[in-house]
Amino acid sequence: MCGIVGYVGQKKATDILVEGLSKLEYRGYDSAGVAVLEDNKIKAEKHKGRLANLEGMLNENPIEGGIGIGHTRWATHGEPSDVNSHPHLNNKETIAVVHNGIIENYNELRNWLMEKGYEFKSETDTEVIPNLVDFYYKGDLLDAVMEATKHMEGSYAIGVICNDEPEKLVAVRKDSPLIVGLGEKEYFIASDIPAVLNHTREVYLLEDKEFVVLTNDGVTLFDEEKNPVEKEVYHITWNVDAAEKGGYEDFMLKEINEQPKAIKDTMTSRIMEEKEVTLDDISITKEYLDNVDRVYIVACGTAYHAGVIGKYAIEKLVRIPVEVDIASEFRYRDAVITDKTLIIVLSQSGETADTLAVLRDGQAKGARVLAVTNVVGSSVSREANDVLYTWAGPEIAVASTKAYVTQLIAMYTLALHFAELKGSKSVEEIEEIKKAMLELPEKVEEILKNTDLIKEFAVKASTEKDLYFLGRGMDYGVAMEGSLKLKEISYIHSEAYAGGELKHGPIALIEKDIPVISLLTQRELMDKMISNVQEVVTRGANVLGVCFKGDMEESKRKMFEGLIEIPETLSLLSPVLSVVPLQLFSYYVAKAKGFDVDKPRNLAKSVTVE
């Protein structure tokens, strides 16, 4: 992985490829490269490091030609290096390939090809693909790619060009996203929509094992048996400007500030006072819910933390047992799944490999799967039984912010919808929650206007090596997200602990002047959290507290080095507000350390490999 772009047209391919790859930089990468057909011969340029390195080399050594493929790599097999970068060529340098995914049987294929006389330069799994295509090439590139994929196990989205058919680009996907852009006498492939937005809003969303041939005359689609495929054109509706910084210094800061709108958009037409929750893409009935004996919420990373909050909300409002699990763990633990199981999967991109695997495994065992995702047309959205979209808009920064808060809104919305169906809460209780939800955008805006204390504490914390987050109940779920954000972009070691677990080990880590952030928005647990704060302060910690305005007694304020007071809301909904200071805190720590907050090291936006 990480980013693929391909182009067929009359313009200079390298310009289109580099521009497209720049729109995919947010996905994370460690090297970049292109291969273009110039005078019926493949010319490739690839380098470790930033896209600017590649662009500089292409300025020094221009490559002409209107057909080419490009790639930004995030290392999975082989260290980041020039030789391991994509595109990869066959031994004769007549076939070039870019690839996202993992070829699981690449060692077997590599050994088999070596027995046939092929040699390998890199440590990557991808290099087997051009040589495998070469082995099966008999004058038709599509046939060769089709035959090669029959022997490839794992996940892949690939783009292929060949000297012998210089007018053609062939691509295919399996368990890794790939779209086809339809322009005016020019055509594209890409691993994500932003790469083609400057050129077209009309795309095909490829399904697994669909092949596509791009030429100057148009686009032809085939299934794995080489039968022609007719597809509906998907029109991209969101604005190109949504994928630009719009005057902000960083995408992350822009996206933090877009949260009020994202929250409002995700509730629009769904949450209304004195009206039942409206979810058009979900056909779950009261009869179905009455038969459900357990709910699993499954996700990865930040989405998992949203799932933790979802568990609290659904259990509280719907009174159905809920388990929340990490997708990469859940899929291997032989969970009890029947036709009475509802699985809720969360994935910002809709392409997270482990989450997709859970979706498919769950359906195979008879479960119904409901997906919460931000990307219309993604694999998760197409394969799930029901879909709830989070209308966060494009999220470019690797560290998720607005996608997370809209996932929270989605989970609350689901919980309310299920509660209405089952009658598990009174109309008055549900109306109180709806009213409070509709007030959240304005309250987030209020937090965003008061950042001085957050900045001050962040600058002090930026020189520390360790930092801890504490919380109980829903606050613990938010603490986990705050800790992850800090790790992701500031590279400071951080852990989140449930307040009640302090005495069971973590308190041994507390020493003089160590920074601790304590969340205190769960009023029924306030006294217990105050005791936890006292425990760490006694041992020398400097504590920043997050609580509702007016909740902290004057006599207890002196324990805190600082106290961020957020607008009051229901304890159930507090994560939407309390996470915002933690996002800003992580942002300002990383900026104080001089780090790139949008593209943190070693991380990718969309993890499409297992």
UniProtKB/Swiss-Prot annotation:
Top EC class for this record: transferase
Entry's localization field: Cytoplasm
Keyword Repressor in annotation: no
One cellular component (GO) term of this entry: cytosol
GO biological process: carbohydrate metabolic process; fructose 6-phosphate metabolic process; protein N-linked glycosylation; UDP-N-acetylglucosamine metabolic process
Catalytic function, reaction form: D-fructose 6-phosphate + L-glutamine = D-glucosamine 6-phosphate + L-glutamate
GO molecular function, one term: glutamine-fructose-6-phosphate transaminase (isomerizing) activity
Assembly and binders: Homodimer.
Functional description taken from the UniProt entry: Catalyzes the first step in hexosamine metabolism, converting fructose-6P into glucosamine-6P using glutamine as a nitrogen source.
Protein name: Glutamine--fructose-6-phosphate aminotransferase [isomerizing]
Record organism: Clostridium perfringens (strain 13 / Type A)
